[in-house]
Amino acid sequence: TYALFVDPEGALFGVLKSDSGDPLDSEVAIGDFFWMDLFAREPSKAGQFYQQVAGYEISKGEVKEGVERVVLTSHDKSRAGVVPLPEDANRAGWLPYVRVADVDATLKKVTTAGGYVMVPPTPELLESNLAIFVDPQGGVLGIVRWDEPQADKE
């Protein structure tokens, strides 16, 4: 059973109840969804909303380039980040990231298939290599090369 909702900042999110329960935490393999970031006008307030609705604990993540990240955690695991929405963005939204072996090779496949690169490879973010692209239908996805097994993500 699942349902879709819109949070107070306009970000679409869904909830799911599986008949088999939640999956166990495991290492993130190449091709697996790796992380989620919510881009919000007021990250602290957005974090509080998800704390009230989904029971997440809130912690402050590392500040990079003057930007403070809110981290949503459960069962002592970091689950998602909440970061400031770019000033030129229209509304809040969630951005999923997928773990890849090679960011540059993946972006070549993206452009060959008709997508375009929104944020070029950026090694400074997440202390790894990260890029964001848009597919031909307008879907936005982040990709990350992560060399170490993920025990916890912040």
Each PLM stretch: what is its role?
Residues 1-6, 33-41, 85-111, 129-134:
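Vicinal oxygen chelate
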Residues 16-48, 53-59, 93-96, 145-154:
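N-terminal beta-strand motif that seeds the catalytic metal site of vicinal oxygen chelate
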